[in-house]
Amino acid sequence: MSRNKVEICGVDTSKLPVLKNEEMRKLFRQLQDEGDDSAREKLVNGNLRLVLSVIQRFNNRGEYVDDLFQVGCIGLMKSIDNFDLSHNVKFSTYAVPMIIGEIRRYLRDNNPIRVSRSLRDIAYKALQVRERLISETSKEPTAEDIAKVLEVPHEEIVFALDAIQDPVSLFEPIYNDGGDPIYVMDQISDERNTDSQWIEELALKEGMRRLNDREKMILRKRFFQGKTQMEVAEEIGISQAQVSRLEKAAIKQMNKNIHQ
Amino acid sequence: MDETVKLNHTCVICDQEKNRGIHLYTKFICLDCERKVISTSTSDPDYAFYVKKLKSIHTPPLYS
């Protein structure tokens, strides 16, 4: 008896009972002839290893594995209820595809974003090709490389790979040193507040600095407060034509100031 | 197993005490809930609820 504990999904595999084929057939007969609950209980628990082995196939596919054990158990219970002894096959022969089917359906129906079957297929093929190209050339292939192998437009590859990305919460922590954690949100740049805009603002400020007060006021009212020439004219007691002229002159002056 | 022994088991899904049902690994599922779970399709909104409830069969409760 090995002392090594193998734990899958929090289930200690060494504690799970194992049933022999004959025992299993006896239990199935008991269940199907007499409707014996305890026989079903033994069958479910005696086949939990089957569920665990199936889950492991789904382990390294980047899917969310946590709930698969329950789904697998439901699949197992479904297959126990539907198993037909008269087919004379081992229970596992029947149960494994049933459990796999249950998990596949669960994953398909519970994806936060529904992706069409064909797109998903392209994405999985692209991932496979990518793996292969990496091992062959030992460098990351471009979308064009993958597209060439799969003979589809490279936009499609990009689109498909994008589509199968899992959505991530803005509050998903990416780094935590015990203090304030860094969330995904903290690493997303604000597109309205980028460096180039900041530089433009500086230039604008510089351009406006050399204008006289009257011109500054008109520009401020026109472009920062969004008033019409008529409104500005009324406010400072000049005609609209004058506002237009002053505005034009000020902008020209600013242009000169900035580009000189 | 006779029925008196099984009495007073709390079902993980409906949280009611039932005497008929099965033990799945560490927890008990009553016959009625088991029937319901088995006949639920994966696309049914109830399915997610069952999966959540059944999670406790392999994740021990956290004590604080």
From Swiss-Prot, chain A:
Reported regulation of activity: Activity repressed by anti-sigma-G factor Gin (csfB) and Lon protease during the early stages of forespore development. When both Gin and sigma-G are expressed in E.coli Gin inhibits sigma-G activity, strongly suggesting Gin inhibits by direct physical interaction.
Motif annotated as Polymerase core binding, chain positions: 67-80
DNA-binding region, residue range(s): 229-248
Expression induction or repression: Expressed and active 2 hours after sporulation starts (at protein level); stimulates its own transcription.
Record keywords, A-Z: DNA-binding, Sigma factor, Sporulation, Transcription, Transcription regulation
InterPro entries from the UniProt entry: RNA_pol_sigma-70_dom, RNA_pol_sigma-B/F/G, RNA_pol_sigma-G, RNA_pol_sigma70, RNA_pol_sigma70_r2, RNA_pol_sigma70_r3, RNA_pol_sigma70_r4, RNA_pol_sigma_r2
Entry GO MF terms: DNA binding; sigma factor activity
A GO BP annotation: sporulation resulting in formation of a cellular spore
Domain of life of the native organism: Bacteria
Cleavable signal peptide: none
CDD domains given in the database record: Sigma70_r4
Keyword DNA-binding belongs to the record: yes
Region annotation Recognizes anti-sigma-G factor Gin (csfB): where it falls in the sequence: 1-71
Gene3D superfamilies cross-referenced by the UniProt entry: 1.20.120.1810, 1.20.140.160
Similarity field: Belongs to the sigma-70 factor family.
Assembly behavior: Interacts with anti-sigma-G factor Gin (csfB).
Function of the molecule: Sigma factors are initiation factors that promote the attachment of RNA polymerase to specific initiation sites and are then released. This sigma factor is responsible for the expression of sporulation specific genes in the forespore.
Domain commentary: Recognition of anti-sigma-G factor Gin (csfB) occurs via the first 71 residues.
Protein name: RNA polymerase sigma-G factor
Organism in which the protein naturally occurs: Bacillus subtilis (strain 168)
Protein encoded by which gene: sigG
UniProtKB/Swiss-Prot annotation, chain B:
Record annotation: effect of changing residue 30 to A: No longer inhibits sigma-G
Pfam families per UniProt: Gin
Residues bound to Zn(2+): 11, 14, 30, 33
Domain of life, source organism: Bacteria
Reported effect, residue 11 to A: No longer inhibits sigma-G
UniProt subunit comment: Probably functions as a homodimer. Interacts with sigma-G factor, recognition occurs via the first 71 residues of sigma-G.
UniProt GO molecular function: metal ion binding
Mutant lacking the gene: phenotype: Premature expression of sigma-G factor (sigG or spoIIIG) activity during the early stages of forespore development. Spore formation continues normally. However its absence has deleterious effects on strain robustness and is strongly selected against in competitions experiments.
Function of the molecule: An anti-sigma-G factor, prevents premature activation of sigma-G factor in the forespore; overexpression leads to 1000-fold reduction in spore formation, spore formation stops after engulfment. Overexpression also inhibits sigma-G transcription activation activity. When both Gin and sigma-G are expressed in E.coli Gin inhibits sigma-G, strongly suggesting Gin inhibits by direct physical interaction.
Name of the protein this chain belongs to: Anti-sigma-G factor Gin
Gene Ontology biological-process annotations: sporulation resulting in formation of a cellular spore
Cofactors (names): Zn(2+)
Record keywords, A-Z: Metal-binding, Sporulation, Transcription, Transcription regulation, Zinc
Entry's cofactor comment: Binds 0.5 mol of zinc/mol protein, probably 1 zinc per dimer.
Organism lineage string: Bacteria, Bacillati, Bacillota, Bacilli, Bacillales
Induction: During sporulation under control of sigma-F factor.
